[in-house]
Amino acid sequence: MKEIKLSNAGGLSRRDALRRAAGAGALISLSPFAGFGVSSAEAAEEALGKFPKHPQWKFVFVNHVTTNPFWVPLRYGAEDACALFGTTFQWTGSEKSIATEMVDAFNTAVSGKADGIAVSLVDPSAFNDPVEKALAAGIPAVSYNADAKGNKRLCYIGQDLFQSGKALGQRIVEGVGEGQVAGFIATPGQLNIQPRMDGAREAIKESGKNIKLDEIATGPTVNEELSRIQAYYTGHPDIKGMFAVDAGSTEGVGKTMAANKLHEKGIHAGGFDLLPTTLDAISKGDLDFTIDQQPYLQGFYTVMVLFVYKISGGLSGLAEINTGLKFVTKGNVDPYLSTQSRFEGSSSEEKVLTRSGPIS
């Protein structure tokens, strides 16, 4: 891979100059413990791409758990896309998955005349009217990470959640065979994770195996999730498997497996997303696998879709984008552990990553 550098008289590359303008303040707001409602720093007037001069459009991301560490790579993706296209974004919503707080944030974006709004549609109907109001005001509204049938959002960027759940269920069938397994879910009913649980349940049913899947609510914060998972295992020591459909619960499963040496007892475990502790648990054998949904792309592509829609006058840009699923196991986890990058949210450093060897 060859990196082409654009130089200027001041010694900074054009990209570096733009990055310093666009990213200096934004990186601070990327802490998973930062409050919601934080804007990215103002981007440079000129975009990196070969685009006609355009206004510095501001896009608003409305999220359901704004301080959860899962979102760090998604926000890096949005930030990098903003630097590329000469736009800015604001991160707002709810810290604890409260739909009314998200609706308030969405309506504030509409009244503030945002240039585009992206919302995680975790509720089946709460955002129907707000989205229609945004569209009526000429503001493009798209969904990311979670989608809702019947909502008039213009497009969805994220994983096919039901199919990823079926893939999880198939792994459960392969690993467990029969018996009782736990399915941990942060917020039952919410559309960013409930479809995964439903997909897993369907796959287990289709297998015909004698496997009972218990759905266990863990809560919207990491500490709650770990506490409830540990408590569940204490009350169900004969469990055959422990699985989760969200990042925090997966992390909690890994910690519970390690604390009780459950892998040595033949208990299987797995879940979703690439939190550093989850990857470490896979490396140590406490988790069998995790499923990646590429949150960086969910942030990057969402900004890209809104930008192209704006710059084309609404003629182009809209696309249903599936950010895919990939199983990360002990056999392929090493590159994730040895590489620190914005793409996985493990580093804020901007750098080109290189690879070698055949692609499988």
Stretches with model-predicted labels:
Residues 1-16, 28-40:
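N-terminal secretory signal peptides
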Residues 45-55, 192, 203-207, 301-360:
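Hinge/cleft segment of the Venus flytrap/periplasmic-binding protein
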Residues 240-241, 247, 254-297, 303-324, ...:
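Exported/periplasmic ABC-transporter solute-binding proteins
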Residues 124-163, 174, 180, 273-288, ...:
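Flexible loop/hinge segments that line or gate small-molecule binding clefts
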Residues 110, 172-177, 233, 302, ...:
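Short, hydrophobic alpha-helical segments
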Residues 34-60:
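C-terminal segment of N-terminal export signals and the immediately downstream linker at the start
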Residues 119-135, 200, 214, 218-281:
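Hydrophobic alpha-helical
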Residues 62-75, 91-102, 123, 146, ...:
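Hinge/beta->alpha junction and helix N-cap segments in small-molecule ligand-binding domains
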